[in-house]
């Protein structure tokens, strides 16, 4: 009899836990879109940001194409009736009272700028959506990739600049720097960030240039500068394109670091 009561109690607790898992999750920033799509079935996602429909995101998370999108407006938030809202800690102050008014649980997920912070973000979000086992599996896969990268570091440590024609170069302490370190390379900019025109970039003389594909195929002054003849000559065969995915700290960032390592190895040849 006692065993039957205990079993019934456990079943009731498990049923309550399953029912408590959020079923209408709304994401208000692209980086939580990506984590959310990794963690839960699309049927539990009420809305992701419109940025999840960008080509770079759809390449990695094609399931995002079937999910409604939002632009973070008050009207959309109220109309969605979410039971969990994923937001940025730096959300507009005017939105905070509105989020409280929905009655939904709000989880603020800070930007992840290194792999330790990625682990923390995954665990925070996985707990919020009731998918902690899935979260740990994502972390384990990421860590396995990072171990492989460390074991296969290039013989020579190349100096690299992330420069896409805009002039601003991310330095130490950011996500790109963490990706470079994982790939076995060194950031040319040792401050938090730098600004380089074509002449100063050539004077700095990094071994390779890394640039994003965000502006590929579009006309802009930034794109024109990127095609400067001096750069085309100096860095022929030493220009590495990365997907816009690298902008968010997510478990797939380890895969981006692998892509960087493979590309840098080709530069050395």
Where are these regions (language model features)?
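N-terminal signal peptide c-region/cleavage motif recognized by signal peptidases
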Residues: 13-17
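Extracytoplasmic ligand-binding site segments that recognize negatively charged/polar headgroups
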Residues: 94, 111-124, 159-175, 218
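Alpha-helical, coiled-coil/dimerization segments enriched in small aliphatic residues
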Residues: 51-56, 63, 169-197
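A short, structured surface patch at a secondary-structure boundary
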Residues: 24-80, 84-90, 188
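Basic- and aromatic-lined ligand-binding clefts that recognize polyanionic substrates
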Residues: 23-40, 133-183
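Boundary at the C-terminal end of the N-terminal hydrophobic targeting segment
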Residues: 18-22
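Structured C-terminal subdomain patch of bacterial secreted/periplasmic proteins
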Residues: 23-24, 28, 116-127, 136, ...
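Bacterial N-terminal signal peptides that target proteins for export
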Residues: 1-7
């Amino acid at each position: 009899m006692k065993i039957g009561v205990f079993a019934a109690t456990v079943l009731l607790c498990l049923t309550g836990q399953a029912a408590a898992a959020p079923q209408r999750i709304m994401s208000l920033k692209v980086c939580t879109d990506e984590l959310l799509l990794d963690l839960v079935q699309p049927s539990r996602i009420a809305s992701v940001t419109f940025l999840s429909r960008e080509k770079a995101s759809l390449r990695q998370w094609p399931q995002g194409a079937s999910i409604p999108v939002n632009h973070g407006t008050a009207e959309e938030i109220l109309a969605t009736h979410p039971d969990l809202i994923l937001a940025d800690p730096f959300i507009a102050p005017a939105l905070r009272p509105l989020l409280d008014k929905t009655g939904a649980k709000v989880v603020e997920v800070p930007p992840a700028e290194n792999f330790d912070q990625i682990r923390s973000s995954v665990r925070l979000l996985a707990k919020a959506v009731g998918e902690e086992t899935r979260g740990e599996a994502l972390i384990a896969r990421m860590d396995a990739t990072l171990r492989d990268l460390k074991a296969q570091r290039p013989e020579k440590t190349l100096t690299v600049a992330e420069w896409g024609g805009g002039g601003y170069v991310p330095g130490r302490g950011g996500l790109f720097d963490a990706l470079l370190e994982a790939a076995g390379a060194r950031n040319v900019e040792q401050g938090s960030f730098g600004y380089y025109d074509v002449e100063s970039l050539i004077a700095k003389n990094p071994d390779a240039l890394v640039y994003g594909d965000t502006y590929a195929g579009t006309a802009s002054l930034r794109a024109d500068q990127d095609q400067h003849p001096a750069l085309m000559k100096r860095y022929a065969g030493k220009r590495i394109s990365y997907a816009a995915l690298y902008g968010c700290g997510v478990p797939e960032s380890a895969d981006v670091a692998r892509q960087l390592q493979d590309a840098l190895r080709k530069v050395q040849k």
